Amino acid sequence: MSSPARSPSVGGATPKQGARTPTRGIASQDVETPMRMGPGRAVRPSDNISLPPTSPGNISLPATSPARGLGANMSEIDLSSPLNYGTPSSMGSIRTPRSGIRGTPLRARPDIRTDKRIRQVAIGGGSGLEPIPEKGSETTDPVSESSQAPQLVVWGTNVVVSQCKSKFKSFIMRFIDPSAEQDEISENIDVNQPLYLQKLEEIHTLEEPYLNLNCAHLKTFDQDLYRQLICYPQEVIPGFDMAINEMFFERYPAALLEHQIQVRPFNADKTRNMRSLNPEDMDQLISISGMVIRSSNVIPEMREAFFSCNICSFSTTVEVDRGRINQPTLCTNCNTNHCFRLIHNRSEFTDKQLVKLQESPDDMAAGQTPHNVLLYAHNDLVDKVQPGDRVTVTGIYRATPLKTGGLSSSVKSVYKTHVDVVHFRKVDNKRLYEDEEGKDHIFPPERVELLQLLAKKPDIYDRLARAIAPSIYENDDIKKGILLQLFGGTKKKHATLGRQNFRSEIHLLLCGDPGTSKSQMLQYVFNLVPRSQYTSGRGSSAVGLTAYVTKDPETRQLVLQTGALVLADNGVCCIDEFDKMNDSTRSVLHEVMEQQTLSIAKAGIICQLNARTSILAAANPAESQWNKRKNIIDNVQLPHTLLSRFDLIFLVLDPQDEIFDKRLASHLVSLYYVTRHEEEDTMFDMSVLRDYIAYAREHLSPTLSDEAQQRLIQAYVDMRKVGAGRGQISAYPRQLESLIRLSEAHAKVRLSNQVELLDVEEAWRLHREALKQSATDPLSGKIDVGILTTGLSTAARKKRADLVAAIKENLKKKGKVLTVPYQKLFSDIKEGSQIMITREQFEDALKEVQDEGAIVVMGKNTIRIC
C-alpha cells in the first residue's frame, strides 16, 4: 500500500526497503499528547526535545502488505501518517500520475511544507509516548501485528491522525449549507443535500482536483477540528487531503485526475490586519486582504535533485531539504569519491511566484503609509492574481532566518516573514465582476432570465442610470455618460486595415464649479469597478501613473513597478483635480488615451505595456468659479490636445436658482432619514447593476446595422455642415469614432448584439448635449469643436490674424527706426483698434510676428525691427 519514505542518502547510499514495525500494544485513551504551550508557543532549544534528522516528508510508518485493498482493511489506512500517505489514487494504479511516495499530500504541496523537523509518536498502552522509528525493524512480530494498532499523533500537537480524518469525513458526509449558492458562484447546488459531496461530484465532472473549503462551515460543524486547522495547518491539511482522496476514489474508482485532490481552506476566522501580524501567528493559518501591486515571473523551485555518477553512470535522487541539496559524496556502485553531477532535466521542479500584497486603504491607520506583505504562490496558484487585483489571501504565516552573508552558514537572529498561499479569493460584493480575457463568469439560469426580462423594459436605460450614484441629485446626462462608460464599446482588431486596434474605452471629463459632487461621482465609480484606481492630480507624478524601475529585494535585479494607469488595465482610472497636474504628468496620458498602450524605456528596460483604461477625470476652473465669458480652455487651463481625446466633456455648474436650491436641499436632507426599506431597494439595484454590466460586457459584441451606419454617416456630415458657412469646424473624425463607441455601449444596455437606429440617436443626443456645454464659443454662442482641437475658436483665430496684420502695418510706418518701445507699440495698436485688446492677446500676436522673423523681442521693454 505504501512504502517507507526516501531520505537524502548519506555518502551516496541508496534507500533500503524497510520491514514492518511491531506495534506496541493497545492504544490508551487516557494518555495526553505533548502539545505546544498555546498556539503561539514554539519549540525552544531549552526544551531539550531531540528531533530525528528527517525532513517533513521523510517519516517512516508501519509497512503493510501490498495485497491489501481498501475494503475490509481500512484501519490499516488509518494508521498511516498524514505526512507521507499514499492516497488510493496511487495504490498500484495508473489512474493518477505522481503515484508512490512522491505523490503523497505533503510532497505534492509545497504551499504547506515546513522547515520544521516533524515527527510522530504512537500512544502505547503502558510505555507512554514512543517515537515512530525512522526505518522498519529487520524482524517482524506477527503476533503484535494482529493486535490493535496504536493511535498516531504529530509530535508537539494534539492532532490525532485517525480522529482528524474521521471527523473531516463526517463533515464532508453530513454538512448541509442552506446558503450554498451565495458562497461560491456555482450551478445546480441543492441546498438540501451535503454541500461538499456535490462539490466532489463537480470535481469528478470537471476533472479539477481542488476542493475549496470554507472554514466558517467547518467551525459551525466541529470547533475542535477548526481550531486544529488554524493552529496546525501544515499537519492537518495533509490529513484532509488523505480523507477527501479516500472518499473520492471510493465513490468514483475509475476517475482520472491530473493529480490528487488538494483541500484549499479559505475564509479563516483568524483574519488579521497586516500590521497586527506578530510572532504568535507563526505557522498558523491566517487570512489577510489587500491589493496586489507586483507579481514576479514564474520561478522554478527544485524539489528533488537527480545525480549521476561520472564514472559508472549510477544514479540517485536527493530531496531538497530546507532549500539545500546534500550532494552525495561517495558512489556505492564504484566506490569513487566526489564523482556525482547534477542532471537538471531529470530533477523535479515546482512553480513558484513572488507576489507583493499592499494594505487596503480601509485597513490603514491614520497618518500611516501602506504596509506590504510578501506572498509565495506555488503550482496552480501561480498567475492566479495580477497587479491591481483586490484579493483575500489565506495562507500559512512563515518566518525564515536571514543569512549573515558570504560562505558562512550562520544566520542572524532577525527573521524575515512571508505567507505561503493556500487560497486566493477575488470577491467583493460591492464591486462589479472583474473583466478577464478568456474567462466568463457563471450566472445562474434564473439570474440570466431576470436580466433578459429587465432588458425588454423600455425604461431600462433610465433605470440603470438612476442606479448610478443615487445619492447625487439630478445630473441625469452625466450619469448616463458614466453608465455607457462602464459598458464600453466593442473591442475590434483589424490588422488588415492598417490599424492594430480600435479603442473601445470611453473617456469622460467633468468640469465645473467646486462643490458640485464631481469627486463623489469619481469615488462611486472607483468603489464599483474591480480594476479601478483613484488618484489626485496634485499628488500624482508621471512615474506614479506609468511605471518606474526599482530593485527587487529578493533577486537584487532591476524590475519594472507599474503605476496607476497600468494597474487599471481593463478598468477605470479616476483622476481628481485634473487641472492641478503638471505638464510632464499630463503628457503621459496622450498615448494611453488613444493608443491604449504605454511605452517605457528606462534603465535598459524597453517595453510596451497594455493600458486599456477608461479615464474619468474631474477638473475645477482656474478662477474657482466658472467664467461664462471664457471658453473651456481658458477656464480649466488644460491643453487642447488632451481635451480632444475625451469622448464626453460635461460641465457641472451651480445654477444659482432658488427653486433648484430648494429641491437640492430637500434631497440632501432626505438622505439622513432613509428607511430600511429604501436601503434594501438600493442594495437590490446595486446587485442588479453589477450583474447586468458584467453580463453585457462578457457576452455581447454589438455590430452596426445598415440603418445605424447610414445614420452615423448623416450625423457626421450634418455636424460638419453646421459651421461650414462661417468657416468653423464643428466635427472631426474623433467625434465620429466617439459616436460609434457610444452607440455600441447603448446597444449593450439593451443586451442587443445589433446597433440599431435608436442607439445612434441617443448617442448623438448625448454627444450634442456635451458639446453644447463644453465646445460653445462664448463670443458667438455657436458650437465650435476647434476650441477642443486647436484651443482657439474661429472668432478668436480671426481676431489674432487681424491683430498680427495691425502690428505689421504699424511697424512699416516706423520707417528706418531700428527699435520700438514695447509699451508704445501696445498703446498705438490699442488706440487704433475698434475692439478691446488685452495684453495677453497682444503678446500672442507679437509672438506670432516674431516667429515669422519680422521682429525680435529684446527683454521686456524693447522690440528690434528686422
UniProtKB/Swiss-Prot annotation:
One of its GO terms (biological process) is mitotic DNA replication initiation. It is found in: Nucleus. Coiled coil: none annotated. Changing residue 518 to A: Slightly reduces complex helicase activity. SUPFAM superfamilies: Nucleic acid-binding proteins (SSF50249), P-loop containing nucleoside triphosphate hydrolases (SSF52540). One of its GO terms (molecular function) is single-stranded DNA binding. Pfam families: MCM, MCM4_WHD, MCM_lid, MCM_N, MCM_OB. Residues 460-669 form the MCM domain. Belongs to the MCM family. This is DNA replication licensing factor MCM4. It comes from Drosophila melanogaster. The lineage of its organism: Eukaryota, Metazoa, Ecdysozoa, Arthropoda, Hexapoda.
